[in-house]
Protein backbone atom coordinates (compact mmCIF):
# COMPACT_ATOMS: atom_id res chain seq x y z
CA UNK A 1 0.00 0.00 0.00
CA UNK A 2 1.36 3.39 -0.98
CA UNK A 3 1.44 6.23 1.50
CA UNK A 4 -0.97 8.99 0.66
CA UNK A 5 0.11 12.52 1.48
CA UNK A 6 -2.71 14.98 1.85
CA UNK A 7 -1.49 18.43 0.88
CA UNK A 8 -3.32 21.40 2.39
CA UNK A 9 -2.53 24.99 1.41
CA UNK A 10 -1.77 27.39 4.26
CA UNK A 11 -4.51 29.29 6.05
CA UNK A 12 -3.96 31.98 8.65
CA UNK A 13 -5.34 31.07 12.05
CA UNK A 14 -4.07 34.24 13.73
CA UNK A 15 -2.95 37.36 11.93
CA UNK A 16 -2.28 40.99 12.86
CA UNK A 17 -4.96 43.68 12.67
CA UNK A 18 -4.66 46.14 9.79
CA UNK A 19 -3.05 48.70 12.14
CA UNK A 20 -0.94 48.29 15.28
CA UNK A 21 0.10 51.23 17.45
CA UNK A 22 3.03 51.27 19.86
CA UNK A 23 4.84 53.86 21.90
CA UNK A 24 8.53 54.28 21.15
CA UNK A 25 10.57 52.10 23.53
CA UNK A 26 7.82 49.51 24.07
CA UNK A 27 7.95 46.03 22.59
CA UNK A 28 5.37 44.75 20.12
CA UNK A 29 4.32 41.31 18.85
CA UNK A 30 2.72 40.87 15.42
CA UNK A 31 0.83 37.58 15.06
CA UNK A 32 1.03 35.27 12.06
CA UNK A 33 -0.03 31.73 12.89
CA UNK A 34 -0.69 29.48 9.90
CA UNK A 35 -1.83 25.90 9.41
CA UNK A 36 -1.35 23.63 6.42
CA UNK A 37 0.28 20.42 5.26
CA UNK A 38 3.19 20.40 4.87
CA UNK A 39 3.75 22.87 7.71
CA UNK A 40 3.88 26.40 6.26
CA UNK A 41 7.06 28.47 6.26
CA UNK A 42 6.52 32.00 7.64
CA UNK A 43 8.35 34.99 6.18
CA UNK A 44 8.06 38.61 7.35
CA UNK A 45 8.82 41.67 5.21
CA UNK A 46 8.77 45.40 5.85
CA UNK A 47 7.76 47.67 2.97
CA UNK A 48 8.20 44.68 0.63
CA UNK A 49 11.80 44.00 1.67
CA UNK A 50 13.16 41.18 3.87
CA UNK A 51 13.72 42.24 7.48
CA UNK A 52 17.20 43.47 8.29
CA UNK A 53 19.45 41.53 10.63
CA UNK A 54 18.51 43.67 13.60
CA UNK A 55 18.84 41.86 16.95
CA UNK A 56 15.65 43.62 18.12
CA UNK A 57 13.64 41.61 15.54
CA UNK A 58 12.81 37.98 16.28
CA UNK A 59 10.63 35.66 14.22
CA UNK A 60 9.40 33.10 16.71
CA UNK A 61 8.69 29.43 15.88
CA UNK A 62 4.96 30.23 16.06
CA UNK A 63 5.40 32.76 13.23
CA UNK A 64 5.05 35.83 15.45
CA UNK A 65 7.29 38.80 14.79
CA UNK A 66 8.58 40.23 18.07
CA UNK A 67 10.12 43.71 17.96
CA UNK A 68 11.95 44.75 21.10
CA UNK A 69 12.21 48.45 22.01
CA UNK A 70 10.31 49.84 19.03
CA UNK A 71 11.88 52.88 17.36
CA UNK A 72 10.41 55.53 15.08
CA UNK A 73 12.29 53.95 12.12
CA UNK A 74 10.23 50.77 12.66
CA UNK A 75 7.11 52.61 11.44
CA UNK A 76 5.74 51.07 8.25
CA UNK A 77 3.87 48.27 6.51
CA UNK A 78 4.70 44.72 7.62
CA UNK A 79 3.58 41.62 5.77
CA UNK A 80 3.67 38.00 6.86
CA UNK A 81 3.49 35.30 4.21
CA UNK A 82 2.88 31.62 4.92
CA UNK A 83 3.83 29.21 2.12
CA UNK A 84 4.10 25.50 1.48
CA UNK A 85 4.11 23.30 -1.62
CA UNK A 86 0.34 23.75 -1.97
CA UNK A 87 0.29 27.55 -2.03
CA UNK A 88 0.56 30.66 0.08
CA UNK A 89 -1.41 33.22 2.03
CA UNK A 90 -0.45 36.64 3.41
CA UNK A 91 -1.61 39.36 5.80
CA UNK A 92 -0.39 42.93 6.25
CA UNK A 93 -0.39 45.44 9.07
CA UNK A 94 0.78 49.01 9.47
CA UNK A 95 2.92 49.61 12.55
CA UNK A 96 2.47 53.15 13.84
CA UNK A 97 5.04 54.33 16.38
CA UNK A 98 4.34 57.37 18.54
CA UNK A 99 6.93 59.32 20.50
CA UNK A 100 7.64 58.56 24.12
CA UNK A 101 8.08 62.20 25.05
CA UNK A 102 4.53 62.79 26.19
CA UNK A 103 4.44 65.80 28.47
CA UNK A 104 2.07 65.90 31.42
CA UNK A 105 -0.55 68.64 31.32
CA UNK A 106 0.71 71.99 32.53
CA UNK A 107 -1.37 73.64 35.22
CA UNK A 108 -0.97 77.37 35.57
CA UNK A 109 -2.48 79.19 38.52
CA UNK A 110 -3.04 82.85 37.86
CA UNK A 111 -3.47 85.08 40.87
CA UNK A 112 -4.89 88.54 40.30
CA UNK A 113 -4.19 91.10 42.95
CA UNK A 114 -6.75 93.85 42.74
CA UNK A 115 -8.13 96.33 45.18
CA UNK A 116 -11.77 96.40 46.11
CA UNK A 117 -12.18 99.58 44.07
CA UNK A 118 -10.58 98.00 40.98
CA UNK A 119 -13.15 95.22 41.14
CA UNK A 120 -15.94 97.78 41.18
CA UNK A 121 -14.42 99.64 38.20
CA UNK A 122 -14.73 96.47 36.19
CA UNK A 123 -18.20 95.51 37.33
CA UNK A 124 -19.75 98.83 38.45
CA UNK A 125 -18.96 102.44 38.85
CA UNK A 126 -16.49 103.07 41.65
CA UNK A 127 -17.16 106.23 43.71
Q: Which sequence ranges carry the predicted segments?
A:
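Immunoglobulin-superfamily
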Residues: 1-127
Amino acid sequence: IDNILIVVPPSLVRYPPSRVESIEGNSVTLNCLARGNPRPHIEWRKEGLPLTLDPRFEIRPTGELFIQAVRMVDYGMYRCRATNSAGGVAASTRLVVTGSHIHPPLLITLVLMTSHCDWFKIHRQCG
